[in-house]
Amino acid sequence: MTLESMMACCLSDEVKESKRINAEIEKQLRRDKRDARRELKLLLLGTGESGKSTFIKQMRIIHGAGYSEEDKRGFTKLVYQNIFTAMQAMIRAMETLKILYKYEQNKANALLIREVDVEKVTTFEHRYVSAIKTLWNDPGIQECYDRRREYQLSDSAKYYLTDVDRIATSGYLPTQQDVLRVRVPTTGIIEYPFDLENIIFRMVDVGGQRSERRKWIHCFENVTSIMFLVALSEYDQVLVESDNENRMEESKALFRTIVTYPWFQNSSVILFLNKKDLLEDKILHSHLVDYFPEFDGPQRDAQAAREFILKMFVDLNPDSDKIIYSHFTCATDTENIRFVFAAVKDTILQLNLKEYNLV
């Protein structure tokens, strides 16, 4: 074999090896691209207290590891703090609304509770338990609770306050429902990834209060679906940030912005009309027509009210080709969310079969 033929042979081996390496790299790049596509980004949007964080907690219960005893124990002081926050809100509202306590001793109880620094609460001492129970049973406080739309009070107030005896026991461990109902305003961005049928669903929850929305902008890339939550029960409530603006009008304005954003042109939109249980309770004594005069359906009819609210939101979509997928939900009800999210998952996968190499 001549030197030239030996060199040609070595060269062709090098070329072959180089080609093989190149092919491997190309293959890996294609694989990486495919794997990246197997991650679906779901952006959870909605105004403050619409139920986004509760929805994320449900995903952890339904599709993740759930909450261990240790995890639940971590919520104990938050439950206590929620109770104090609720009672303090009602004590302040008693003054604002000029409602009198029926029982004289409750003036002293109110003073005791009012002076508590909620953020420093880590235990639930007997004197506070006793004061809160006596206050909650006062007809004045009950009247104040019935007028809660006139001030800011957590949806979980009644749930916790009617169960103070259980929560006050020594060795109290929050239940799954206690965890779901804890209210902690979301500041910043919370991501929760979970794996379903070899596809990663990355759910992103951003704060709903106005001050938090500035932080949304960088979440807008590669969003598969927008999941927009509306609290059905907020039709007669005012904003935390502005007490002369209706919460549902704010929610509508935000939804209109979202469905018309160029960023979201290719993202599917799923509308969750949440807190259907609270609507059913509230509609019996607070009439939708008083806040939305265009409502011409029957009073005290939850079905008519929710269909009207759904239509109000769907009508904000100017693109007739874009379908708004909608579901009525109760985010604190695990079985309801399990059922609804199974349907949502199927919708998202159907819409993205080709894009995400799922076929």
Curated annotation (Swiss-Prot):
GO BP terms: action potential; adenylate cyclase-modulating G protein-coupled receptor signaling pathway; cellular response to pH; cranial skeletal system development; developmental pigmentation; endothelin receptor signaling pathway; entrainment of circadian clock; G protein-coupled acetylcholine receptor signaling pathway
Alphabetically ordered keywords of this record: Cell membrane, Cytoplasm, GTP-binding, Hydrolase, Lipoprotein, Magnesium, Membrane, Metal-binding, Nucleotide-binding, Palmitate, Transducer
Residues lipid-modified (S-palmitoyl cysteine): C9, C10
Residues bound to GTP: 46-53, 180-183, 274-277, 331
Gene3D superfamilies assigned: GI Alpha 1, domain 2-like, P-loop containing nucleotide triphosphate hydrolases
Membrane topology: Lipid-anchor
Region entry G4 motif, spans: 270-277
Region described as G5 motif: spans on this chain: 329-334
Residue intervals of the G-alpha domain: 38-359
One MF annotation (Gene Ontology) recorded for this entry: G protein-coupled receptor binding
Thylakoid found in the keyword field: no
Lineage: superkingdom: Eukaryota
Region (G3 motif) location: 201-210
Compartments in which it is found: Cell membrane; Cytoplasm
Segments of this protein annotated with the region G2 motif: 178-186
GO cellular component, one term: synapse
SMART domains per UniProt: G_alpha
Stretch list, region G1 motif: 41-54
Annotated coiled-coil segments of the chain: none
Biological function: Guanine nucleotide-binding proteins (G proteins) function as transducers downstream of G protein-coupled receptors (GPCRs) in numerous signaling cascades. The alpha chain contains the guanine nucleotide binding site and alternates between an active, GTP-bound state and an inactive, GDP-bound state. Signaling by an activated GPCR promotes GDP release and GTP binding. The alpha subunit has a low GTPase activity that converts bound GTP to GDP, thereby terminating the signal. Both GDP release and GTP hydrolysis are modulated by numerous regulatory proteins.
Known partners and oligomeric status: G proteins are composed of 3 units; alpha, beta and gamma. The alpha chain contains the guanine nucleotide binding site. Interacts with RGS22. Interacts with NTSR1.
Family: Belongs to the G-alpha family. G(q) subfamily.
Annotated protein name in UniProt: Guanine nucleotide-binding protein subunit alpha-11
Organism: Bos taurus
